[in-house]
Amino acid sequence: SVWIAGRQNGATESDCEAAVTSCVADYRQQIRKLSEEPLLQRWYERLDLERLSTTVSDRTLRAEIERSARRARTRTSDRALPRFTERRNGERRIVEEPPLITRLSEADAGQLAEALDEYLLTLPKQWRRLLAGYTLLDCAHKVVGVGSVGLRAYVALCEGSSPDDVIFLQVKQARRSVVARYVHGESALHAHQGQRVVEYQQALQTLSDPLLGWATINDR
């Protein structure tokens, strides 16, 4: 992703390689640092926007970080509603944008609906009770980021107490981690790859999405 971002911004291949090397080196250094900290301190370690801004010396990059943060705060379901949905025969539906967003077959849509029911059971009870009040209106296949190329990904539109009370749920296929072959013992065993992704994301993030969960579609 770092290399592709460099290309997109006009950097040379050698600069892209240097950026990737720097990122990997910093990642290894941070992992080593965390391994030496007390367990509780390691658990609550976080990198927020304020800390990130103070570690960046380049003024242009700092401004870009702040701009990206402001843009991220506007990415809510109510903002996405007019852009990604339309009224069709009196019902709200997801707008198709081939090849990025495409309609599912009736069979695939039915399997996704069943998977969402299964997904509810993996949520904490209070969130399961809340989300159970929403009704699935529509779903579609959606092309997502570079790291998910070749994997199945869907978006589901759900309605709550009114036509304006909507949420979008994203469903992404998870596969076995590339580092799993180097890990031994209990931590290397995961019966469900979606569960693995959710549990580790909850462990890595100080405040993770409370609606993270998992399900199975066609044995995936």
Q: Which residues fall in each region the model found?
A:
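Conserved ATP-binding subdomain of kinase catalytic cores across diverse folds
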Residues: 1-74, 117-220
